[in-house]
């Protein structure tokens, strides 16, 4: 490449920095939109070679005086929102994509908010430039000029697509529509990329305003609240001409003057805030519907509805009542509230909408007052009713219905004039007599029905099949013992005891000595009538010590005798011991679940027929329990051995044995 071509390439590099900086600073300023004498970026501008676009700071000379031998630092251009002239009464907020407002600063507490940072550089240190192999003599100046024109067009398009351009257009529209424009401006600044960039007194680009971006997982080196764009670099023998930008995702800044109630931005700022403060206990609505309610020109009228239920004490809970011109009066007089929120701490729909714009409420006021009684000793608060409005409307209704009342009276007179149209009174009296007769017949059937119910209950309760099934289910299951039938059905229990029912199962139980019975556990030896324990009628414990009852003769209706050894340390006494007087009240018809206490010997039986009388012992349950608790050990066994002669329940003197 000749020296002439080198000079052309150096001149193109100088124009690259000059045009890039001028294009960014001009498009990003308000002068581009407001000034009629602003530069038009048309085809002629991109084709011609110019030295100066507009007044640029002197720092730009460092890049426009490039001679091909010196090292050029990166050119940095910052686009920022200038807040120096913003009064202290203004607040700055940022709106995200979900219309949530985030506080930025108040007044001019922060002087700037950095929106974008451009990086324009001549890169000759990167590996892509060093590894690039150019064929022939290199890129000609004509081809390089065409590539740079294409780069500038792409840069101009990119500038109009960034979020800061939308903010600039919004500020310009507000300034044109109002006499007093907001004292904020979008400006640019050219910096030397080799020097450190400080953010003291301003909000830098690396600082996120929306805190929700901290929860986003970011795998790149770019912060979550920023985005980055790069333009394809252009190759020269002196290095790669690069342009890149990092910018904020969200630039919808809102400015509100707290001293002016009718500020143009007050409605835009307060509208999302009302949406967020509405109680969540109300019926779910979309974001657009809530915005329409808050705006006066978008108010819609809904049909009011109410539902009543009784949660704890009688009280009505209604759904949202909205004005409706054609709807009738709601008789429930319920207000729109969240049932679990205090009215002073939550904002309901009644407080978010203007009451003066809703004159069509009849008997119901939309407010945030609790209206039903709870179970926490709170008094019932009635909703406020506009009595004067209701009376006025009733008076108007009466005036409008005078003509209808006259027509109705004429119709009634016409009916009274014809006796055949009047109802007969004799027919109604006959119907009353028939009805009273039916009631009397029904009342006469009640005694017979009651007697039939008692007979049926008696037959079911004394049925032996049901009794045996109940006892078998209790003996083989782990459920608690069921209660026996009432004592009224077993007045003659002694006469129903026959000979087979007095036989004892197994001969081994009859020959057991009385001394072996002494070794058994005191509590388990007691009969259930003395408060003892029936192992087969109780549930299993954590440490089972019971053995299964040996059922060798299932066909015989024998008297069950307990032979189960139980741990001597386990005394399981009944809380309410029964006396022997109540034995007849706890017996079924065909079985006698009676177990002999150990102080009485086993009854003597033979294979032949025998008759026995059953006598009531003189020992009571209270005496036996007190005797067991007072006497223990060997002394107690000795006392038992001394009284063996008085232990019989069945006496053999009354038995009539047949002669062989």
UniProtKB/Swiss-Prot annotation:
One of its GO terms (cellular component) is cytosol. InterPro entries: ATG13, Atg13_N, HORMA_dom_sf. It is found in: Cytoplasm; Preautophagosomal structure. One of its GO terms (molecular function) is protein kinase regulator activity. Residues 315-369, 467-516, 572-597 are annotated as: Disordered. Residues 321-335, 470-479, 504-515 have a biased composition (Low complexity). One of its GO terms (biological process) is mitophagy. Coiled coil: none annotated. It holds the Pfam family ATG13. The keyword Cytoplasm applies. Residues 349-369, 480-498, 574-597 have a biased composition (Polar residues). Interacts with ATG1 to form the ATG1-ATG13 kinase complex. Belongs to the ATG13 family. Fungi subfamily. Activates the ATG1 kinase in a nutritional condition dependent manner through the TOR pathway, leading to autophagy. Also involved in cytoplasm to vacuole transport (Cvt) and more specifically in Cvt vesicle formation. Seems to play a role in the switching machinery regulating the conversion between the Cvt pathway and autophagy. Finally, ATG13 is also required for glycogen storage during stationary phase. This is Autophagy-related protein 13. It comes from Candida glabrata (strain ATCC 2001 / BCRC 20586 / JCM 3761 / NBRC 0622 / NRRL Y-65 / CBS 138). The gene is ATG13.
